[in-house]
C-alpha cells in the first residue's frame, strides 16, 4: 500500500493537483510547484501533445482507471448526443467504485474499489463486485452488514461528505442524477482529452 501511495503523491506533485481529492499529498509541507525528480525544477514548456496527454493521464490517475478502461469509456461517450468531454466525466463518475467513494463509504477510490471487489455491496438488491460497473441513475447501492461495523467504514463516514447528486440513508445510497459540469473538479479540462483522442 505504501508504494501505491508514494506513486500517487509523486503524480499529484507532477500534475499539480490532489489526485486523492483531499490534499493529503500536500499536508506535510508547502505544496511544490515543480515535478518530482532530480531535474524537476527545470521549467520546460510542454509541447501541445504533452498538454493533451497530461490532461488525460491526470483524470485517469484521479479516478484509478487503466488505459483500456479509459479508452473504452471515451469510445462510448463519443457516440452519444451531447458534449463528449462532459459525458465522459459523467460516465466515469457513474462507476460503482466512484459512487461508493462519493457516498462517503470509503476514504479513497482505491479503498472503495477494494470494498467492491470483496463483494460488500449490492445494486438494486443484486450482488455487485465489479468496480468498473457503470450504474444507472435511480439505482440504489447498499452496503452489506458484514462491512458496516468496520473501523475503516466508520472512519470514512465521519470524515467524508456525500456528493449532492446522491441521497444517503444509513448504509444505503440512491444515485439521483448525473453530476453537472460545474460539480466536477475545476482543475479538469476535458476539452484537451477530447482533442487528444481526436488527433489519434
UniProtKB/Swiss-Prot annotation:
Keyword DNA repair applies: no
One Gene Ontology cellular component: small ribosomal subunit
Cited SMART domains: Ribosomal_S4 (SM01390), S4 (SM00363)
Superkingdom of the source species: Bacteria
One of the GO biological process terms: ribosomal small subunit biogenesis
InterPro entries referenced in this protein's UniProt entry, alphabetically: Ribosomal_uS4, Ribosomal_uS4_bac-type, Ribosomal_uS4_CS, Ribosomal_uS4_N, S4_RNA-bd, S4_RNA-bd_sf
GO molecular function: rRNA binding; structural constituent of ribosome
Entry keywords, A to Z: Ribonucleoprotein, Ribosomal protein, RNA-binding, rRNA-binding
Residue ranges of domain S4 RNA-binding in the record: 94-157
Family: Belongs to the universal ribosomal protein uS4 family.
Described purpose of this protein according to its UniProt entry: One of the primary rRNA binding proteins, it binds directly to 16S rRNA where it nucleates assembly of the body of the 30S subunit. With S5 and S12 plays an important role in translational accuracy.
Assembly and binders: Part of the 30S ribosomal subunit. Contacts protein S5. The interaction surface between S4 and S5 is involved in control of translational fidelity.
Protein name: Small ribosomal subunit protein uS4
Organism: Metamycoplasma arthritidis (strain 158L3-1)
Lineage: Bacteria, Bacillati, Mycoplasmatota, Mycoplasmoidales, Metamycoplasmataceae
Gene: rpsD
Amino acid at each position: 500500500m505504501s508504494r501505491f501511495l508514494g506513486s500517487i503523491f509523486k503524480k499529484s506533485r507532477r500534475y499539480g493537483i490532489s489526485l486523492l481529492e483531499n490534499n493529503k499529498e500536500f499536508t506535510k509541507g508547502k505544496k511544490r510547484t515543480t515535478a518530482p525528480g532530480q531535474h524537476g525544477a527545470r521549467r520546460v514548456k510542454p509541447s501541445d501533445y504533452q498538454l493533451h496527454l497530461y490532461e488525460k493521464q491526470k483524470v485517469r490517475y484521479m479516478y484509478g482507471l487503466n488505459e483500456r478502461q479509459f479508452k473504452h469509456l471515451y469510445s462510448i461517450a463519443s457516440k452519444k448526443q451531447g458534449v463528449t468531454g462532459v459525458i465522459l466525466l459523467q460516465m466515469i463518475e457513474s462507476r460503482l467504485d466512484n459512487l461508493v467513494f462519493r457516498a462517503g463509504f470509503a476514504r479513497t477510490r482505491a479503498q472503495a474499489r477494494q470494498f467492491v471487489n470483496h463483494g460488500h455491496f449490492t445494486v438494486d438488491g443484486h450482488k455487485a463486485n465489479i468496480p468498473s460497473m457503470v450504474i444507472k441513475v435511480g439505482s440504489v447501492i447498499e452496503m452489506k452488514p458484514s462491512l458496516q461495523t468496520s473501523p475503516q467504514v466508520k472512519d470514512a463516514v465521519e470524515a467524508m461528505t456525500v456528493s449532492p447528486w446522491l441521497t444517503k440513508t444509513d448504509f444505503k445510497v440512491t444515485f439521483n442524477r448525473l453530476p453537472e459540469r460545474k460539480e466536477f473538479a475545476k482543475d479538469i479540462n476535458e476539452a484537451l482529452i477530447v482533442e487528444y483522442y481526436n488527433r489519434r
